Design a protein with these regions (language model features):
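Basic, nucleic-acid-interacting segments
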Residues: 1-288
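Single conserved hydrophobic/aromatic residue that forms the stacking wall/gate
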Residues: 287-296
């Protein structure tokens, strides 16, 4: 049986703003925990979020640079899930009205041009940071420390359509997107500092099938090398499973950099699991003027 892989990439880029997405707390780069906090970014009752105009401008700039259609009106939604580093128990994001839709990004591999289709570009606030004792995995940790300096930092999320067919294409796409964010001066794009993070959604299906296979999400890829190796491993794992008659389960898997394998983290959530609904607190906005792109 001839099989083909299909890959989609979700990328989060930390924006170069002085303050957080919905409050006036400074964006800080420090190892000292919990020094840039306020009632808004740690979700205390009664605190009202006010959107960061500069962050929305940066996201719009990236959306324009990738040829997206800019929505005339934007609004914010609550993405509901429960995790210790999410103090409100929901994340302010965007759902059916993102900043941009239906763009593309040109990549070059071995002097050959290709275009990766982008489904959407939208805003999302960052979570806090969890540090687990021991191996760094929550399953084996005896304690977990929480740092909320990062909570509420503005991110732009870029979601591709499932059009990538190899790890080489995926790496080329991330390299190009990273360079674009640096050229636009909207992010430092430093992987080692977590300015740019990415997850891969991978499925394998028969070559002649018009439908995609069961999607598996891969997390914890902290470098381009990790991205390439994790995708290659997961394609091989799913291919062997299908050839052996084993059903692929929709789930989220963790890339182990040392063992160079993926392992099950949890069942994969869908949009219904997050129970998106419009957030009544931050005001919606309208794109009255658009930023100008020069020299890119």
């Amino acid at each position: 049986m001839s099989l083909k892989p299909t890959i989609g990439i979700e990328t989060h880029i930390e924006l170069n703003t002085n303050t957080k997405m919905f409050c006036r707390c400074a964006v800080v780069d420090t190892d000292e925990p919990n020094i840039s906090l306020c009632p808004t970014c740690i979700g205390l009752p009664g605190a009202l979020p006010v959107p960061n105009k500069k962050a929305i401008e940066f996201i719009t700039l990236l959306a324009l640079s990738t040829g997206c259609e800019i929505t005339s009106k934007g609004m914010f939604h609550r993405k509901n899930y429960f995790y210790p580093d999410l103090p409100k128990n929901y994340q302010i994001s965007q759902f059916d009205l993102p900043v941009g839709l239906n763009g593309e990004l040109e990549i070059v591999i071995d002097e050959n041009k290709d275009y990766i289709q982008i489904e959407r570009v939208h805003m999302e606030e960052d979570t806090g940071k969890s540090s687990h004792s021991g191996s760094g995995r929550i399953e084996s940790a005896t304690s977990t420390a929480l740092d909320f300096n990062r909570s509420g930092v503005p991110l732009v999320e870029i979601v591709t359509k499932p059009v990538i067919s190899s790890s080489k294409q995926a790496v080329a796409y991330i390299e190009e997107l990273r360079q674009l964010s640096i050229d636009l001066n909207i992010s430092e794009g430093r992987l080692e500092k977590g300015n740019l993070r990415f997850d891969a959604n991978i499925s394998v299906a028969p070559e002649d099938s018009t439908e995609l296979g069961t999607k598996v999400e891969i997390k914890n890829m902290n470098s381009l090398r990790s991205l390439e190796r994790a995708i290659d491993f997961e394609i091989q794992r799913q291919t062997k499973a299908l050839e052996d008659g084993v059903e692929i389960v929709q789930e989220t898997r963790h890339w182990d950099e040392n063992k160079e394998v993926t392992s099950t983290m949890r069942s994969k959530e869908g949009s219904a699991d997050y129970r998106y609904f419009s957030d009544p607190d931050p005001v919606s906005y309208t794109h009255l003027t658009l930023p100008t792109i020069t020299g890119v």
